[in-house]
C-alpha cells in the first residue's frame, strides 16, 4: 500500500470511528496562547496567522480530501488535517530546526518538516513556500507568469527544486482587512494540490495595557 493510500485509509477509519462514537480522535493541537487576532491592511504585515479550509491531494493512483487547520508564526508551525466530522488524523508541528509528525497512531521526527512529510507520506509539498502563496506573496524562486489588473499574481512557477511547481491563484477574498487568496491550485509532475481558505486570520502579540505587568 502506498503512503497516500495509507493516509486515505487512516482518514476513512477515523471518519468511521467518529461517526459511530461521535468522539474526536487522534491528537489535539495546543493553542498559540501568546497570539491574538489583529486587523491588517496588507497580508505582508501579518508575521503570524491561522487558517481553516479544505485540502485536496491527487496523484495518478489515489486522491484525498480533508479539512486543514494551520497556525503559522515566524518560528513555529502547527498543521492539522481532519475528517469532515472533525477527527484529527494528522498533525505536523515544526520549528526551523525540528519537526514532529503524528499519523495513524505513530510519531515521526526529523529536523526538517518538508523532508519528514515527504518521507512518511510520499508528498513533496513545498511547506517553506506555502506561507507566502497563502498570503498572496511571491518568493525569490518564483517567476510570476500572469498578474491580474490589480497586480496580484494569477499564475507563477517555482523553480527551486525541479520539476517546477505551477501555482494558480484561482480567486481572492478579504480576510482580517487584507486581500488573500481564496483558492489555490498547485501542480507538479503527477501531484496536484487544491487549497481553499475558508477563514484566514492575522495574528499578533497582544497589546500590553498601561499599568499591566509585562
From Swiss-Prot:
This is Outer-membrane lipoprotein LolB. It is found in: Cell outer membrane. GO terms for biological process: lipoprotein localization to outer membrane; protein transport. Residues 1-25 form the signal peptide. The lineage of its organism: Bacteria, Pseudomonadati, Pseudomonadota, Gammaproteobacteria, Alteromonadales. It comes from Shewanella baltica (strain OS195). Coiled coil: none annotated. It is a lipid-anchor. Keywords: Cell outer membrane, Chaperone, Lipoprotein, Membrane, Palmitate, Protein transport, Signal, Transport.
Amino acid at each position: 500500500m502506498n503512503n497516500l493510500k495509507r493516509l486515505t485509509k487512516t482518514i476513512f477509519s477515523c471518519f468511521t470511528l467518529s461517526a459511530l462514537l461521535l468522539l474526536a480522535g487522534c491528537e489535539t493541537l495546543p493553542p498559540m496562547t501568546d497570539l491574538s487576532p489583529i486587523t491588517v491592511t496588507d497580508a505582508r504585515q501579518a508575521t503570524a496567522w491561522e487558517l481553516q479550509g479544505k485540502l485536496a491531494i491527487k496523484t495518478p493512483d489515489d486522491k484525498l480530501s480533508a479539512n486543514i487547520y494551520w497556525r503559522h508564526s515566524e518560528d513555529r508551525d502547527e498543521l492539522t488535517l481532519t475528517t469532515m466530522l472533525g477527527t484529527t488524523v494528522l498533525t505536523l508541528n515544526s520549528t526551523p530546526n525540528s519537526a514532529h509528525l503524528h499519523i495513524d497512531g505513530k510519531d515521526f521526527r526529523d529536523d526538517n518538516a518538508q523532508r519528514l512529510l515527504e518521507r512518511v507520506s510520499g508528498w513533496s509539498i513545498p511547506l517553506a513556500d506555502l506561507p507566502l502563496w497563502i498570503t498572496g506573496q511571491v518568493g525569490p524562486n518564483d517567476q510570476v507568469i500572469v498578474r491580474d489588473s490589480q497586480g496580484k499574481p494569477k499564475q507563477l512557477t517555482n523553480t527551486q527544486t525541479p520539476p517546477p511547481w505551477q501555482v494558480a491563484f484561482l480567486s481572492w477574498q478579504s480576510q482580517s482587512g487584507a486581500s488573500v487568496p481564496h483558492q489555490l491550485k498547485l501542480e507538479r509532475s503527477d501531484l496536484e494540490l487544491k487549497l481553499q481558505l475558508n477563514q484566514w486570520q492575522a495574528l499578533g502579540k497582544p497589546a500590553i495595557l498601561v499599568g499591566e505587568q509585562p
